[in-house]
Amino acid sequence: SVSGVASKYAIANEYDKMMTAMGAQGTNAFTSFEKTVYTDDVPANALNKYITVQAERFRNPVLRIFHTELEAVYEEKNRSLDSDNSEVFETLFASLFKKHNYGLQTTIGTVEHLKNPSLKEIRKYFHTYYVPNNMAVVLSGDFNPDEAIAEIDKAFSYMTPKAVPQYTFEKEEPITAP
């Protein structure tokens, strides 16, 4: 399998080790309805190095550890299947948004989606939506903002804006009763 071949080249915890080496903490990511967020707490003296790493990550993602990430997502999905809170949340959104993706599918997808992921479709999604006019960089802390913006502009200058497909959906019927 592709995952089996890729695992031969995977470097365990490569990204986390790189972040730790520059003093970063709190490395994490999450996806919600309208966004995917990557977070790190980075020392100000490592900001330029961090920006360079992030720019390279988005230039041409290496998906050699995709199989292990998928396993983590699959586990998260399995936990949600056993969670009353998740069931209430999904039922609520399915009831409120009968014609919108908020109610038609969960952010994480279905078990079937996770069983048969297409790297081709993942790359297509990445190249469609991970474009500069659909992204934001948010920084806070003890650094010179003008220097940081200049460094971000330089590091991400290879990216070119392009049209992002507009999501369209049918108007929901008014809720007239509890």
State where each predicted segment sits.
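Active-site recognition of the HExxH zinc-binding catalytic motif
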Residues: 1
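Non-catalytic beta-strand/loop surface segments
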Residues: 4-45, 80-134, 158-178
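M16/insulysin-pitrilysin zinc metalloprotease superfamily fold
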Residues: 5, 40-70
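Hydrophobic face of alpha-helices
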Residues: 12, 51, 67-70, 89, ...
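Soluble periplasmic/extracytoplasmic beta-strand elements of cell-envelope proteins
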Residues: 37-41, 50, 136-142
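Generic, well-ordered alpha-helical scaffold segments in large soluble proteins
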Residues: 53, 57, 76, 95, ...
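Acidic/histidine-enriched alpha-helical segments
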Residues: 62-78, 144, 163-177
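Non-catalytic, conformational "gating/processing" segments within enzyme and secreted inhibitor domains
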Residues: 70-71, 119-155
